[in-house]
Amino acid sequence: MKTGKIEVIIHNAQIVSINKYLIYEDTNNVFHYRNNNFVDVFSSKYFFNIVEDNYGITYTKTHLSKANFQDEILWQFPLSSLGGTEYEPGKTDKIDKILGIAHGNIWFYTDFGRLVALDLETGDVVKKISGNPSDKNSTYEMTLGLGDCFFRPLDKNIVSVSGFDFQIIDTEQLAVTEQYDFREADPMGIGTYRSIYSPMLQGDYFTFLGIKEEDFGYIRWIGIFDYKARKLVWEYEVISEEEFDETRNQLVPPQPLYMSGNKLYVKDIKDNLHIFEREDI
């Protein structure tokens, strides 16, 4: 039996330390981390997305499952039961991201814009929240369109940032407890942006890439928004209009603005890394 200690995993360009052991009987197999799951590189079989002391959580395109380390499935949740969407007839919803465990429930976000909580012991549905218009008149609790969802470790609540809406979902109350349009809250700051992309939760802030109202569909700006104070606290024009006109260089959604310590990092479409030193904001 092979025992391998997993010490560092790279995920979303951030280093996460995990002090867990992965045990597998075949000593010839190699494991690596990809797409939020442990993967056997020879069979492409997914192992565990979340590893606890005596069980793991994993998912495929069709099911989310809880299993112990003796290959016993404790429960399975069929993703087909979440329903389809009028925008993609015939397609089944899939998990976009497993967010975390809070108050005895496991939360995940789906491709069709749904936020779902399952009872960790039974796999039963505890809460279903949706911003998908297809879910009106259904068992989903409707809210404004959910965007990028983040699990906040400090209070185990979930933060959603969409194109213009900010929401907090209280995982204990199982309810949306805060919701506002940040363009309306800060019209002279973040309200000057036509669109924002790739928000990243960073403590009391979220970072973003943005297109100003006067721009023409290309991303040149980055910014930091204080979601508690509800105001833009910093912005910067990374790519000038002149540079874009000459080189067509721009920022792209797959390369968000990262904050690490007092440094900010963002890459442009030409793979240039821009580094900023963050002062008090």
Describe the predicted segments one by one.
Residues 1-281:
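Secretory-pathway ectodomains
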